[in-house]
């Protein structure tokens, strides 16, 4: 055995046996949402320890070890002993008691989003890929603003056990989207855009998270099985959640993504150091929409694969995260083309009040009109120390439009500039006026711009 192999083995053994002193923050959409909603500034709870304060990404470290509980009814007895209604009925007290007694965290996000847009009438049809090469009767799409979106997203995480053998965490998240009057898809057709004016352009039901995770001792390795989506890790703090940050399709998610909104599978995650994280996994290729959990698809032997690497350094300026996602999707009836995609995300706190981010993503094939995107922006949270929900953001996305993806595409590029200001009203309610400016709509050569005005009302409990 060579000296190099012995040295490498020793270093790996040392890294896996050393307890992580302060795990750095790696972005996860639903875990972050749970942490944010269960750590409001005005929660009546003991002050967190120094270890809890520096480890914001670990749910289990903030919960009472369930290995100390005895009996099936222990969580109920502990919940009663917490006496959450001693000083009156309060949502925050109930959630805190539920977390302390049963190791459960709950987040409920409900938003109402009216959007006004201009222009309102198209001048040419927006044909589907099936119409390519055929002479279709040209129709005019007309939409009457505003379009009202109602989005409800409940999430929960339950620590089932916490012992010397590791921790078991069950996590669930569901998204329900409904529209009144026009929907965003019709508005986008009328404006003749390649990208939508929000993250959910039509009525949707998405089972985005239904997983069980086994975190092994020292939290270096974890194995997750169940239904999940890569949207949870593909992004940064404010460009991956329409209910919190930017609203437009190109700035609220990866607009080139061809992976599933939620599908059954498994992934293995390894943290070689406190600031790095590696992930590899697979999913059923048939469930594209994630509207339900389809167990029978696992026997059809078609799977999507992904690899993910994240680095979350801490410097004198503040914390940051830099990640790369690679994925391959198979050809299935719901998506008639095999694709390979990538997404590179970078974010950095310049100070406690300034956060900058960027994304470069792309995909092969012609599944969606947008096949490349470059975006960057900045955000400032609680700039005036008035309310923790206060947030100001501005960003820009340059979208490369594939000419063969839609027969009506007239331009190769479409640019969106967006700015918003979230104003917190108490610990749970917020309002966010938002403005989107589209330069050179890809499907409308006779217009140089299109505009969208929005006011998002969000209740986060």
Curated annotation (Swiss-Prot):
Domain of life, per lineage: Bacteria
UniProt keyword terms in alphabetical order: Amino-acid transport, Cell outer membrane, Ion transport, Membrane, Porin, Signal, Transmembrane, Transmembrane beta strand, Transport, Virulence
GO CC annotation terms, alphabetical: cell outer membrane; pore complex
GO BP: amino acid transport; carbohydrate transport; monoatomic ion transport
InterPro entries xref list: Carb-sel_porin_OprB, OprB_sf
Pfam family, one: OprB
Membrane topology value: Multi-pass membrane protein
Position of the signal peptide: 1-22
Subcellular location: Cell outer membrane
GO molecular function list: porin activity
Function statement: Facilitates L-arginine uptake, as part of the AaxABC system. The arginine uptake by the bacterium in the macrophage may be a virulence factor against the host innate immune response.
Protein name (record): Porin AaxA
Organism for this UniProt entry: Chlamydia trachomatis serovar D (strain ATCC VR-885 / DSM 19411 / UW-3/Cx)
Lineage of source species: Bacteria, Pseudomonadati, Chlamydiota, Chlamydiia, Chlamydiales
């Amino acid at each position: 055995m060579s000296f190099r192999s012995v040295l490498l083995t020793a270093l790996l053994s040392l890294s896996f046996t050393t307890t992580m002193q302060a795990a750095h923050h790696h972005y996860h959409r639903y875990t972050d949402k749970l942490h944010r909603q269960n750590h409001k500034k005005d929660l009546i709870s003991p002050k967190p320890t120094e270890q809890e304060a520096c480890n914001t990404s670990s749910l289990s470290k903030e919960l009472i070890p369930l290995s100390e509980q005895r009996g099936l009814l222990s969580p109920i007895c502990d919940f009663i002993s917490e006496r959450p209604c001693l000083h009156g009925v309060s949502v925050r007290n109930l959630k805190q008691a539920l977390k302390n007694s049963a190791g459960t965290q709950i987040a409920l996000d409900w938003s109402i989003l009216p959007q006004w847009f201009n222009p309102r009438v198209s001048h040419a049809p927006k044909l589907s890929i099936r119409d390519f090469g055929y002479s279709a009767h040209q129709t005019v799409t007309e939409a009457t603003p505003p379009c009202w979106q109602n989005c409800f997203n409940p999430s929960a995480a339950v620590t089932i056990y916490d012992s010397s053998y590791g921790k078991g965490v069950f996590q669930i998240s569901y998204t329900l989207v409904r529209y009144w009057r026009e929907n965003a898809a019709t508005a986008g057709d009328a404006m003749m855009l390649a990208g939508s004016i929000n993250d959910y352009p039509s009525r949707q039901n998405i089972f985005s998270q239904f997983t069980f995770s086994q975190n092994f001792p020292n939290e270096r390795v974890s194995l997750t099985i169940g239904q999940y989506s890569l949207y949870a890790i593909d992004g940064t703090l404010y460009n991956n959640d329409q209910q919190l940050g930017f609203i437009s399709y190109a700035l609220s998610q990866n607009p080139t993504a061809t992976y599933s909104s939620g599908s059954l599978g498994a992934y293995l995650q390894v943290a070689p150091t406190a600031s790095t994280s590696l992930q590899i996994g697979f999913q059923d290729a048939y469930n594209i929409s994630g509207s339900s959990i389809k167990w029978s698809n696992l026997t059809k032997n078609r799977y999507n694969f992904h690899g993910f690497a994240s680095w979350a350094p801490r410097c004198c300026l503040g914390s940051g995260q830099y990640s790369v996602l690679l994925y391959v999707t198979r050809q299935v009836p719901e998506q008639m083309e095999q694709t390979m995609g990538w997404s590179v995300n970078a974010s950095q706190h310049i100070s406690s009040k300034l956060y900058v981010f960027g994304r470069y993503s792309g995909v092969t094939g012609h599944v969606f009109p947008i096949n490349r995107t470059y975006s960057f922006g900045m955000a400032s949270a609680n700039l005036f120390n008035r309310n923790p929900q206060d947030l100001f953001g501005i960003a820009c996305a340059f979208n490369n439009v594939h000419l063969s993806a839609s027969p009506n595409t007239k331009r190769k590029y479409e640019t969106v500039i967006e700015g918003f200001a979230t104003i917190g009203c108490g610990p749970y309610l917020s309002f966010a006026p938002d403005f989107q400016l589209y330069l050179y709509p890809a499907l409308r050569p006779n217009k140089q711009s299109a505009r969208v005005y929005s006011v998002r009302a969000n209740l986060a409990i």
